[in-house]
Amino acid sequence: MDIITIIIAVIAGIGGGFGISKFLEKSGVSNLIKNAKKEASSILKDANLEGENIKKDKILQAKEKFIELKSEHEQVILTRDRKVAEVEKRVRDKESQVSGELSKAKKINDDFEAKTNEYNTKLENLEKKQVEVEKMHKSQLQQLEVISGLSTEEAKNQLIEGLKSEAKTQAMAHIQETIEEAKLTAQQEAKKIIISTIQRVGTEEAVENCVSVFNIESDDVKGRIIGREGRNIRAIEAATGVEIIVDDTPEAIILSCFDPVRREIARLALHKLVTDGRIHPARIEEVVAKTTKQIDDEIIEVGKRTVIDLGIHGLHPELIKVVGRMKYRSSYGQNLLQHSREVSKLCGIMAAELGLNVKLAKRAGLLHDIGKVPDAESDLPHALLGMQWAEKYGEKEEVCNAIGAHHDEIEMKSLLSPIVQVCDAISGARPGARRQVLDSYIQRLKDLEEVAYGFNGVKSAYAIQAGRELRVIVESEKVSDDNASNLSFEISQKIQTEMTYPGQVKVTVIRETRAVNIAK
């Protein structure tokens, strides 16, 4: 019983404790709810108050924006009204101006109609008077025909014939007088111009020279230039086409060749070889090639310097090169570049005296002998060849005609043509200017070389020993050793049948085979 009582007591205690705890828990939640409601009420009140403030601010901002937009709109309306007023004013002014112009036009039209009516009236009166005059004229003609016994046509023909005869007589007399006066005046003026031009020219005399002297420091250098068994000197002659003469002349070697360009290349190449000290066939070929390039550059520089000195502009580069090559050419012993410069200056002086184009005259004078400097031999006269070059490189028609006509091969169509012809004669015909011997000698050597070039397989040909020997270098692929002898015979036979020459001409055919490999 006691145990049951205890158990009941325990259960009752547990139940009572649980009830007390539940009561206490319920009482705390109630307080929390009350506090939450208070806080929510306070927050809601604050939110309503803040919302009212925001609402008032927004309403105030909206009112300010409305006032601003209203002001802008009113300003736009005012601006538009002002522009409309200005346009209306311009329209009214334009209408007033147009109205005035219409009034003027109406007045002018009325005046024109009045003048037209007046003109028509005068025209009618004039036509009436013209009819009356024609009637009177016919009446007078009829009376004259009756008196003279001639018809109108017969009288007119007699009068015309008489006037023609008288006019022809007077015209012939006047023409004859004018011709005589022109001849006298032209001769006097031409003499005056030519004398004035000649007096302003002074140049050197012609010099005939086919050799150059290469000075050396000692005779020991001669042996190095000759080389073992003469291989060096043969290599120089083969590379340059110049005959090297080594004789007893102390400290000097003679270079003989009719072509000044070849002589100059040989002289410069020898100078480089002796200065460098390395003289052997391979080095000789290398130096000659470089020297040839150097001479080509120098030719271009000489051409540019010449045209600048003469004040000639716009010349084609190829023509400038031809002008530079004139330095190494001569005509009858007269240096071609000096002659052309002289003719150019003379043409400029004479053109200035005659009131012609000085620049064109100097241009034609400088280029008149470019046909004497051909890249290859041509059958054309040098004047026509020069004219072809000038046309090819864009020179003016007057200049081309002056070049082609200065030896009368073509008709002179330009005023520059006779000027160039006269100035060429002044430069070449004065005492000491030219000598015939050198030019004919050089032409004979050129012809000798051209004979060799006419055969197949010939690479180059050089006339040496004053034309007594012709060295022909052939291509080993085209000419065999057996054919070399036959080629030499054929060339000698052609020279014998086609050319006139003193003494004998030795023909030497040189054939060389080279095998070159490179070790890498």
From Swiss-Prot:
Domain spans labelled HD? 336-429
Show the disulfide pairing.
none
| Pfam families the record matches | HD (PF01966), KH_1 (PF00013), RNase_Y_N (PF12072)
The broad enzyme category this protein falls into is hydrolase
Task: Tell me a GO biological process for this protein.
Answer: mRNA catabolic process
**Could you tell me the EC number(s) of this protein?**
3.1.-.-
Q: Where in the cell is it found?
A: Cell membrane
Q: How does it sit in the membrane?
A: Single-pass membrane protein
Matching InterPro entries? HD/PDEase_dom, HD_domain, HDIG_dom, KH_dom, KH_dom_type_1, KH_dom_type_1_sf, Ribonuclease_Y, RNase_Y_N
Q: Which UniProt keywords apply?
A: Cell membrane, Endonuclease, Hydrolase, Membrane, Nuclease, RNA-binding, Transmembrane, Transmembrane helix
Q: Which GO terms describe its molecular function?
A: RNA binding; RNA endonuclease activity
Could you list the residue ranges that cross the membrane?
Answer: 1-21
PROSITE patterns per the record? HD, KH_TYPE_1
Q: Indicate whether RNA-binding appears among the record's keywords.
A: yes
Q: Where is the KH domain?
A: 210-276
**Cellular component terms (Gene Ontology):** plasma membrane
Briefly, what is this protein's role? Endoribonuclease that initiates mRNA decay.
UniProt similarity note: Belongs to the RNase Y family.
Identification of the protein by name: Ribonuclease Y
